[in-house]
């Protein structure tokens, strides 16, 4: 299923952490391009998919608003000028609707 929201954005847009946290996974996947997972306090986890590059490493501490990745993964669905970034928010293993918590 689809557990997050898709955000249309220009290529090479910086992807920022939504809250302070620690990078717990960062790498390339064949289905989602470069993906970053950030563990936050109180058992929240944010996930950033369809990136063309990653700016942080596993174990790095990040602040809310800090750049963690860059959009623009070539998935065959994106035009050359724009792309899709997927954002997910999880709490204790349950997916949340990000738009209830964050204004995009």
Residue ranges and their predicted role:
Residues 8, 14-18, 48-49, 59-62:
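Small beta-strand-rich domains/subdomains or short beta-sheet motifs embedded
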Residues 58-104:
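Conserved, short, structured surface segments that act as functional micro-motifs
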Residues 11, 27-30, 52-55, 72, ...:
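A generic structural motif
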Residues 16, 22-24, 63, 69-70:
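Hydrophobic beta-strand signal
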Residues 1-17, 40, 91:
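Short glycine/threonine/proline-enriched tight-turn/helix- or strand-capping micro-motif at secondary-structure
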Residues 2-4, 18, 31-33, 80-84:
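Extracytoplasmic
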Residues 4-6, 35-37, 47, 86-88:
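Soluble periplasmic/extracytoplasmic beta-strand elements of cell-envelope proteins
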Residues 17-54:
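Zn2+-dependent peptidoglycan hydrolase active-site motif and core
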């Amino acid at each position: 299923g689809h557990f997050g929201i898709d955000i249309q954005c220009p290529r090479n847009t910086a992807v920022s952490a939504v809250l302070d946290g620690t990078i717990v996974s960062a790498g390339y996947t064949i289905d989602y391009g470069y993906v970053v997972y950030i563990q936050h306090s109180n058992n929240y986890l944010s996930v950033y998919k369809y990136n063309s590059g990653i700016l942080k490493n596993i174990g790095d501490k990040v602040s809310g608003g800090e750049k963690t990745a860059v959009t623009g993964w070539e998935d065959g669905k994106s035009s050359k000028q724009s792309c899709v970034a997927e954002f997910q928010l999880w709490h204790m293993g349950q997916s949340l609707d990000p738009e209830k918590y964050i204004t995009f």
